[in-house]
Amino acid sequence: ENDKGAKDTMEDNVKQFGVHNVQIIPDLSEGSMAKIPTPRLSFIVANKHLEEDIQRLLKKNPKMQFVIYTLELNILSGIKPLFDKYGISNMEVLQINVAKTNKDSMFVNQPAPWLITGEVL
């Protein structure tokens, strides 16, 4: 994660929930990838560099498992072809929808992210 605020939030969540096997890296450049142990699972916030991110991760671990997060339908629609291209199978897509009430007891929708999973067998 290259956004400092988002990275800080992720690091706070790792500490708060006691998840000690999570490493947040600033980017997927070759320099960053060289500094980390071989991951078995990656959680990616999808962006315009998703294909390059997948390529770099598969170079580090050809049997990688993926979890991809996006709010954008156009990104979601492009993931299946990418998974097919790189031999990533067992694709599952899940959308999480949360609503809460405001002070007037009115429902307020929250962002409804898509989580897409897949793995190279």
What are these regions (language model features)?
Residues 1-6, 46, 71:
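Short beta->alpha hinge that forms the Motif I/post-I loop of the SAM-binding pocket
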Residues 114-116:
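C-terminal capping/lid region of NAD(P)-dependent oxidoreductase domains
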